[in-house]
Swiss-Prot record:
GO annotation terms (biological process): poly(A)+ mRNA export from nucleus; protein transport; seed development
Family per similarity comment: Belongs to the GLE1 family.
Region (Disordered): 69-94, 220-243
Primary localization: nucleus
Lineage per the UniProt record: Eukaryota, Viridiplantae, Streptophyta, Embryophyta, Tracheophyta
Subcellular location: Nucleus envelope; Nucleus, Nuclear pore complex
Reported function: Required for seed viability.
Name of protein: mRNA export factor GLE1
């Protein structure tokens, strides 16, 4: 338990509090005394200066220290700021002498009556015993404070030691952490170095492989460039020839211009010839239309065998096939009439465009880039504003069917389908050209009107039927490129052929050529139904051929059809059906041509109404 010492006087007198723990310096004391003096002067008429006194015990004591409480200091802060100059004057007086002086204080005689009472003193007078007790208490407090200060110093020293120890430990921990981080950094650096070495090795190998591939591609590109350069030179040579022909024609035209009379005569003759030709063509078209109408009417009124008698010749064909043939031939005639009118009204020579189309068709080969390139070339010709589209379509259909140097029929069929996707009227005109060139593409047969066929005629028949078979089996389903005369039309043709067409060398050649190119696609689509048709060919069509009296010219074709059926060649994809790859194509055509083996996944449909 501690001893609490309290002075034998009130803790606060006139706003002045006694501080149990004095810690003032001399300047603070002087300022406080000046403040007290100012307050006391307010109650005394004649303020008395404070002087030094001796202790009652007959000895001089230490300086008396007064302390104002914090509450009083806060209340007096405003007053101290107002009397700052006055406090400085009092401080100088107290420092120079040993008493307080108020030299600047003005006292008037009129204010003497206001303060008649006796002066008051700051402290009550103490007795001897009380003074001694106060001294003892003060000494005891001083000793206790010294002990407390010593203990606080010891505690502070121990705390500082603990802090230093903690700081040292923290420094060691941080140093250890830095050491571990450095070790981990070195390990990570070593690992990254190993990864970089492995990656560099891998990249070197990949780069070497890519370099080898690039060398191979460069050699391939150089080879293709050489071929393209040769083709370019050939095209340049052809263009030069065309240019020379045009120059020659222009020279002739200039010669005609010089002779105006001759030119007028030529124009009059040409006009007469054109008019006569138009009249003749119109008459021929009307006559042909009348003949076809008569044929259709005779077919419509025929019996189940569909035999029509016309001038002693019997036409054997299905009624639906004849209607389609007539419809297509009519479109072709209308197109030819339109083209003739365009040629007569225009001074432009369109033969160069027709020759260009024929040259492009002859250059078609069984490669993807060739097919794509020729399609682009033909489309450019069709879109050339110098030549009407109808003339280009007619030339394309005629050249495609009648070209003797027949290229790959499968490649030509792809070209036909894609051109028809751009210009839908092409297919009917092309089929009409097929029907004009070979009646077995209808299929149709005229009995007792067949003249002696030579080898060239059979070759043309074989070429046309192979192209027709390749066309019907071509199945392309990308964007707008759809075969409108697809495999179902081939199935209908085969049914009509076996039902209506008799067996002879020409019909056998047509059937064999058709099966060679379309048999694989028909089997892929119709499976067991196609096998039934194969049995019909074997048991009926071939038997009729063998039953002929003179079979010397039929032995070869019978052997070919028999080998095709017995060896089941319809299970093997025909040669040339799959396009070869020679370069990289970046078009919609390439995506379709890259289909594996071009095996069309046909859906089963019933086409019984075609029989």
């Amino acid at each position: 338990m501690g001893i609490v010492l309290e002075p034998p006087c009130p803790k606060s007198v006139d706003g002045i509090s006694i501080d149990p723990e004095p810690n003032w310096n001399f300047e603070s004391l002087v300022a406080e005394i000046a403040s007290v003096e100012k307050k006391l002067n307010g109650f005394s008429m004649y303020p008395q200066p404070i002087t030094n006194t001796t202790l009652r015990m007959g000895r001089r004591g230490g300086g008396f220290v007064m302390h104002v409480s914090e509450d009083e200091m806060e209340s007096d802060e405003g007053e101290e700021s107002d009397d700052e100059e006055e406090e400085e004057d009092h401080s100088q007086i107290c420092t120079a002498g040993k008493r307080f002086a108020c030299d600047e204080l003005y006292l008037s005689d009129e204010s003497d009556e206001e303060f008649d009472h006796e002066p008051e003193y700051m402290m009550n007078k103490l007795g001897l015993a009380e003074s001694a007790l106060y001294e003892v208490i003060n000494d005891h407090q001083t000793e206790i404070k010294d002990d407390i200060r010593n203990q606080v110093s010891v505690v502070e020293t121990e705390i500082m030691n603990e802090i230093e120890t903690s700081l040292s430990a923290i420094a060691r921990v941080e140093k250890y952490s830095e050491t571990r981080k450095e070790v981990e950094r070195k390990l990570d650096l070593q690992y990254q170095r190993k990864v970089a070495e492995a990656l560099d090795t891998h990249l070197t190998a990949v780069q070497r492989e890519h370099k080898i591939k690039s060398q191979i591609e460069e050699r391939k590109i150089r080879s293709e460039e050489a071929q393209e350069e040769a083709r370019r030179k050939e095209r340049a040579h052809q263009e030069e020839k065309i240019r020379q022909e045009k120059a020659r024609a222009e020279a002739q035209m200039l010669a005609k211009i010089r002779a105006e009379e001759e030119k007028k005569e030529v124009e009059r003759k040409a006009a007469r010839e054109v008019a006569e030709k138009e009249v003749a063509d119109r008459k021929a078209a009307e006559q042909k239309l009348a003949e076809q109408k008569a044929v259709i009417e005779s077919v419509t009124g025929s019996s189940a065998t569909s035999n029509a008698q016309a001038g002693g010749n019997s036409i054997r064909a299905a009624e639906s096939a004849l209607i389609l043939e007539n419809h297509r031939l009519k479109k072709l005639e209308e197109l030819e009439t339109t083209n003739q009118s365009l040629k007569s009204r225009s001074n432009e020579n369109f033969s160069s465009f027709e020759k260009h189309i024929g040259r492009v068709i002859r250059q078609i080969s069984g490669t993807k880039d060739s097919v794509s390139g020729k399609i682009n070339d033909i489309v450019k010709i069709f879109k050339d504003p110098r030549c009407p589209v109808s003339i280009s379509i007619a030339a394309f259909a005629k050249k495609m069917v009648t070209t003797k140097e027949k290229p790959n029929p499968f490649a030509c069929s792809y070209v036909i389908v894609y051109i028809n996707s751009q210009f839908p009227q092409v297919m009917d005109i092309l089929l009409a050209e097929f029907h004009k060139a070979c009646i077995y593409t209808v299929p149709k047969h005229i009995v007792n009107s067949q003249s002696a066929w030579d080898s060239d005629a059979y070759e043309r028949l074989d070429s046309i039927m192979r192209l027709y078979g390749a066309l019907v089996q071509t199945d392309i389903r990308v964007g707008n490129a759809t075969n409108v005369h697809g495999i179902e039309h081939g199935w209908a043709w085969l049914a009509r052929f076996l039902n209506k067409i008799p067996a002879n060398r020409a019909t056998a050649t047509a059937l064999n050529s058709f099966l060679q190119t379309a048999g694989f696609g028909l089997h892929q689509r119709y499976k067991s139904q196609f096998l039934k048709v194969v049995n019909v060919v074997r048991e009926h069509f071939l038997q009729k051929l063998r039953a002929k009296k003179d079979t010397s010219d039929l032995l070869v074709i019978i052997a070919e059809i028999t080998a095709y059926l017995d060896d089941r060649m319809y299970l093997k994809e025909p040669e040339g059906r799959a396009m070869k790859t020679t370069s990289t194509l970046s078009s919609e055509l390439t995506a379709e041509l890259n289909q594996p083996n071009y095996n069309q996944n046909y859906q089963r449909n019933d086409y019984r109404n075609y029989y």
